[in-house]
Amino acid sequence: MAKDQRNVEAITPMEMDFAKWYTDICLKAELVDYASVKGFMILRPYGYAIWENIQRIMDGMFKKTGHVNVAMPVLIPESLLKKEGELVEGFAPEVAWVTMGGSEKLEERLAFRPTSETMFCDHWHNVLQSYRELPMLYNQWCSVIRWEKTTRPFLRSREFWWQEGHTIHETAEEAIAETEQQLNCYADFCRDALAMPVVKGRKTDKEKFAGAEATYTIEAMMKDRKALQSGTSHYFGDKFSRAYDVTFTGRDNKLQYPFQTSWGSTTRLIGACIMTHSDNNGLVLPPAVAPVQVVVVPIAQHKPGVLDAANALKSRLEAMDLRVKLDDSEQSPGWKFAQYEMKGVPLRVEIGPKDMEKQQCCIARRDTGEKTFVPLADLESAVQQLLRDVHDNLYAMAEKNLEDNTFDLTTWEEVRDMAQGRGGFARTKWCGSLECELAMKEKAGVSSRCMPLKQSGTVGKCPVCGKECTTDIYWGVAY
């Protein structure tokens, strides 16, 4: 029990050391564990349950827009990977290779997939024939390996779980529309499931995906006011189709190259959730992705009728299609309260002998700590409303953090002072030159996050060169 108690209590305050606070929550809330291979992580049952909820919601969104799931091989022949020069150049430092099959050296090295554009293109080269088969709207849920130098749970690891969507289209216009649709899908998911506001925008040429004509992104602000790229959507034009000889017979009976997209989001979303909502008592989860949405804690459970009453509450809540846990263990109520705060359970329902006499229960919110006494007859409606309130409050607090820490600045010195001080997002004008983008990194210590889709259209000056320009851009220190 003493060991369990330490698990509940030992969290470094975020104000003291944000990075240590984050790692403490990942470990103490039993989301992950470190693997024997450096840079790899074990997703523990509670952490994987969050990922399953993300998958379930997001997969439903994909299917509503006509996407189907497939599974591609984990290994890619080196010759196949090299067909698209920009892609292999972009990922070369991160690729892990298989050189042996059993005790025999392979004739050709095989790459563990860092991403799967090559495998999808190879497949489409073999199966696509006519424009009548288009569009092909594919998605896969899998893990990929990228040999990152610096790793942190959920944010950067050498193996991570994700979904990667890959589509091909008859026209460029259809492919561009797909790219924009999936970006909006990610933004909607973050708002509706994670209670997390994001900035939607386009990456600069320097920051775009290797081989893409355009990359779109959603950028979120964490509690330490750093940026976290939380999902990307790429438009490739017909570049990959040409590299991999993917063709179809068009409406004019001539061979044509389809236009391609890809888009992805990862277990990084769990890290985003932690750093957007959690506090010094542990994990705080929005109800939509919480493995347990309501925990029922009996008070003085050894007394007659208490466990029966708690089980009755559990049954009623489960009938609402909620994820519910009844903790009837021998731990003290105080330990249980701290444990489920650590686990980020949105609502805690308490019932004891006095509550039974009054035909009520006590409901505590994880986000605010507020307690409400609710008549047992009103349980369902109260819980339903409180779960909505938790989501809305989490979103409102995250939105306030984003709005209060986004600054309209005009010089690189102002951006530097912001980055070295409080932190946040700097919104400036930008002339569009790579030189000025690199200078912002060198002088101000920030990277370009995105050019927001909603542009103001006003004229201003580039913070580096002073040229008049109209493009709005966000800068920040990023994970």
Model-derived regions: residue spans:
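NTP/phosphate- and nucleic-acid-binding module
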Residues: 1-479
